[in-house]
């Protein structure tokens, strides 16, 4: 691929994550987008879950049973001349680590909000991560088919709670059973709420070109008045502010009834960025159109295909072109690897990928070479992208195999699930017992379920409660420092740390050993 072809291919890519609070409709809107891409023939619904027709992006057994996304799925499709990569992030708050890493691999985000509830805690947390990265955020106010909060309240809340300017691209004409349509500010038309797509044209003043019965409805008159108010007193549309994440375009609609979703997708593709540069550890920007291939591993997933017990490393391509069978260097080890087995995803289905370019997400079959955060490159110049953030756990549990005769599957399961970041592993410095660390309780439940379901290994979990993890320099360590209030353990890399039972125990330790330096992260 020559330089111009590479540039054209990269320009067509749109790679984004969908973020939301649980039950805001994230999976449903993902389904509708896949429908437009021709990937699925019908979108799943909440009711369909009970009949066994699960959402396409929820592939893991526990996700199907509980109706929550606990891993980040990757889906790719073509639409309107663009190659779209969607990363469907975990909606449950316990999976912030996986979500955070996923948000490092995208160029923009779509924030789905339940219009009956407004901004919820998980939405706020995920928004702040996107804002910190300075990536564009597009807002979809979902569930317009149900009665919800006043649209003006929702837009005001965006600005006041999240501290971002908002610009409505369309406006509801009624809601719930009284939903008559959408005033499409972006396309200067009315989108009627009918079984088949139907539009009414507006003149330059934003009024109907031809008379229509909808004019007599009070919801239409209210919408016209609110739109007029926003045009006078609201924010101005500003592409530059969208690009930096300072202004979020707001779309109203219903993912469940597929109303307003296509309008959103078309506008998103026009204003969302193509792949952007990534910084290496030296602070140098690696441009996506650079000829030399590079990328980083942001996720590892074991057992995506239970029949093969495989392990996939998810790679965000940052520059250049990927060709199957190419040789690359793994920066962490300096080892040369041949990328012969590569794949692209549609939840649990996949196909071999021959070529891909910057912006694409591909899966590499992994026999144990990769770790989360690894950089690979194909050029002569070594590249190491900025490290992905690690979260320090607050909840801990001691874990052991229920059946001592199944130690092999127990150890294999723990090794693989820890490598993919499902939980963090520690070892008691004295006894060698395994201790798991997690951000939230659900991570332990998922771990226990997957150990039994995927590795046929029942585990015994003993709660240790909340702890504060603090690392210590090995040269300052004395094993006598350990006590019941500050348990000495090793992390998976062999580095020593203490698990303090509370802040009082930590202060007591600091008073007794004033010269010992403790750190919150390795």
Curated annotation (Swiss-Prot):
A UniProt-annotated Pfam family: GTP_EFTU
GO MF term list: GTP binding; GTPase activity; translation release factor activity, codon nonspecific; translation release factor activity, codon specific
Residues annotated as binding GTP: 20-27, 88-92, 142-145
Keyword vocabulary terms for this entry: Cytoplasm, GTP-binding, Nucleotide-binding, Protein biosynthesis
GO biological process, one term: regulation of translational termination
PROSITE patterns attached to this UniProt entry: G_TR_1, G_TR_2
Domain of life (superkingdom): Bacteria
InterPro entries: EF-G-like_DII, EFG_III/V, G_TR_CS, P-loop_NTPase, PrfC, RF3_C, RF3_dom_3_sf, RF3_GTP-bd
Keyword Flavoprotein: no
Task performed by this protein: Increases the formation of ribosomal termination complexes and stimulates activities of RF-1 and RF-2. It binds guanine nucleotides and has strong preference for UGA stop codons. It may interact directly with the ribosome. The stimulation of RF-1 and RF-2 is significantly reduced by GTP and GDP, but not by GMP.
Protein name (database record): Peptide chain release factor 3
Originating organism: Pediococcus pentosaceus (strain ATCC 25745 / CCUG 21536 / LMG 10740 / 183-1w)
